Each structure stands twice: as structure tokens, then as C-alpha cells.
Amino acid sequence: MDPKLLDYYGSDAADVYLERARRTLAAAGLDPVVGMDFFSDQDGLLCGINDCVEILGGVLGAGDEAWALAEGSAMERREIVLRVRGRYSRFGRMETALLGILASCSGWATRAREVVLAAGGKRVISFGARHVHPLVGPTMEYAAVVGGCAGCATPGGARMAGLTGPSGTMPHAMILIFGDTVLAARAFDAEMPDDVLRIVLVDTFKDEAEEALRVAEALGERLRGVRLDTPRERGRVTVDLVKEVRARLDLAGHPQVGIFVSGGLTVERIRDFVAAGAPVDSYGVGMTISAAPPIGFTADIKEVDGVPRTKRGRIPGLPENPRLEKVL
């Protein structure tokens, strides 16, 4: 890991009392080997552990060790997901960063898993980067993929998740500038390489079903799908609208054209689409994933120089968790 980033995690991004503790302990000549356990306050899907291991790998020294659950593991409330045994001076200042990474990433991944399960086997793409700070957008999308999303919108998120590339359609802005959906679709088709799916927005200017047919006639077999993103002001995308678009495409001889739904999708709305048998092929989900609340994590010292010791309310010593694997 970049030394400058490590320094940032241990200074500007760290709770100030950790630096004050480091200075006080150093002045007293105290640098014990401590055993510290990290655990969550609720069930969920663990994410961010790979980043934590990378951080620890940059600060731990000879004789220090770490164990962790695997990235993407299901975790239970109060289950130990990360254990570090090492000199406190080496890793203590990273506590804020380690907890924050686990909290945010696990919150996003857990919500993504809920969305994916609600979709009943249909593809879910993360569209949430526009709802978070750009410095964390790719990390959020990586967590969404860990949670089960089939793709994400940003190149950075796709790269972090090991995908072949980002997923996306086209913005309303481009269609508005062209002034006609078919003109925009033809220009897009002419410019984009073959590996970019031709999925066209059809809610900008005309009735969605009418526009879907116009685009299907214009692009023919090259059209992979139409995207319905009807805004709140027009009642959003409904089950009936999806069924109508599907029926009209089929009647016109375009059964290969899929239907991609986005726009304010929640877990409950997706469940409603599935329960009603709406012929949706893929969902684009944004804020429901990106605005997921973080999962609280705690880090406690449980052992000091081999002697069980912890704060009141906790059990001293390092309990066994057979799911932990040695990572450092």
C-alpha cells in the first residue's frame, strides 16, 4: 500500500485520541504485544476485509500476526471477523480506518445482497456512485459486487471488483442534446465498440412503449434492451408499463429486446415487480445500495502480553473462531 495513504489513515483520518495514546505509551516506555478482536453489532455480509489486511500488511512487523474471515462471508452479530496480535505501537493508530472500512463496505454489501435476493435471479447493476463522494464511489461499487450485483457503473468499481468492465446505458442528457431518441440511438450504435451493449433509454420524449418500438425498428438485432427510467413526476416505472412494453415488443417481432428498469428502486419495489410477474430482465439500483447504513464494528483489546485483559462488559482472552484464517 502507498506509504502516503498509510500515513493518512494513521494521522488525518484517525481519531486524535489514538495518536495521543501512542505518544503517552511511548513516553512511558510501554509497547506490549496485544491481541485485538474486531466484531460487528449485527448479522450481515462482511466486506472490506481485504483492504484491512492490506493496511495491516503495511504496518505490522516481525512476529505480528492477523486472522480474518474471507471477504464476502456471512457474519453473525458479535462474531470475530478480524483478529490482530502484535505490537500496539505498530497498528493501534489504524483502528479508526479499519473500523470505518468494515462498517461502510459491509453495510453496502449487506444491502446489495438484500436487493439481489429480492430480484429473484434477475441481474442487478449498481448505479449508486452518483450518490456518494467520488473518492469512495468505486469502493461502494466494489462492495455492491461483493454483495451479488452483476455489474457496476464506474470503471474504478469494475476494476476493483475484477470485472471485465463497467456497465451502463446512455444518459438522458445525450438524448436531449440530439433531440430525438432514435437519432441518439443510431449515433451511439455507430460510435460504440461491439462489446458495449446497446441499451437505449425510452422515457425521454415519447410514450415508453412507442419509443421502444421506434428504437427496435431502427437498430434491429443490434438492440440488446430498452431502459425504463420514468421519473416520479410521471408515476415511475410500474408493473403494467413493463408488461405493456414487453407485449408490444413481442407483437412487433422483437422478443430479443430485454427490459432494464431503474429509477428509485427499493427492495420493496423490486419484490413487487417479481411478485407480479413483471417481465424485467435487469434492474439498475442506486441510492438503495449507496445510502445503506453502515454496520457498526467494535475493536477491543482482549489480551496484553499474553495475559487475558479487557474492559468491563467484555470477556477477557481470545476466544476460538474456527472460521478465522491466518492472513498475515
Model-predicted segments: where are they?
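Glycine-rich phosphate/ribose-binding loops and adjacent secondary-structure elements
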Residues: H172-L328
